[in-house]
Amino acid sequence: MTKLKHEVAVPAAALIHPTLMLTGRSASAVYVQPAAQLRRLANAGAIIKIAHGYYVAIPVDKRKGDWLPSLETLTAGLATAIYGQGNGALWGLSAARVHGALPRAIATGFALGPSQHRPLALAVRPGEVHFRMRDPERLEVEYLSTELGPGLVTSIEQTILDLSGQEFVSDSEPRVEAVRNLMAMANADRLAELAARVRGRAALARARKLLANAH
């Protein structure tokens, strides 16, 4: 167990391996009354409630500061907590943020997994996380390292196709900025091959048109 302030410890067995995420279900492996114990840990500053039913253990080296993970990190943690390790991933604008293609902050996190899940309002910052039912095994995803543990994120090329799945409405929407920046990062051959494999040729055509219109 890791010692935190006020001599309160978060049992490793209560965490959702291999992350710092906790839920009532994961805490029940240690506590008879998990809800009460999670409240105790939160009141002691050992964990943070990030959404209804979901908590994060504060790392030892962050316990004295105002530590708060980014929206993308929280989204990745929730995806793993809900779907299990290797079954949830960041996609869409969240993936674009991770890849550095969307500098401006957004208020919504986007995650995918093998089943549908209701949106979760965040308790620690304005915003919410939306979930989409998609099988990550059918997508091109990459390993993602976060403060809360390992996760997955759609590749640059997959993110381009995802964000270009619908017509672009105006240049002011964040998808436009994200796709233009991602196209500059992408491997053209890999993108074309992926588009052919996942029936994304129409999406690729939109992305190419968007890039051409920018010049």
What are the residue ranges of the model-derived segments?
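N-terminal low-hydrophobic presequence detector
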Residues: 1, 5, 60-61, 68, ...
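Detector for methionine-enriched segments
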Residues: 1, 21, 133, 183-185
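Short amphipathic alpha-helical interface segments
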Residues: 2-26
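Exposed alpha-helical structural elements
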Residues: 10-11, 37, 69-78, 94, ...
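Short gly/ser-rich loop at a beta-strand->alpha-helix junction or flexible surface loop bordering the NTP-binding
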Residues: 18-25, 35-142
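Alpha-helical residues within the helix-turn-helix
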Residues: 29
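Hydrophobic alpha-helical interaction segments
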Residues: 108, 136-215
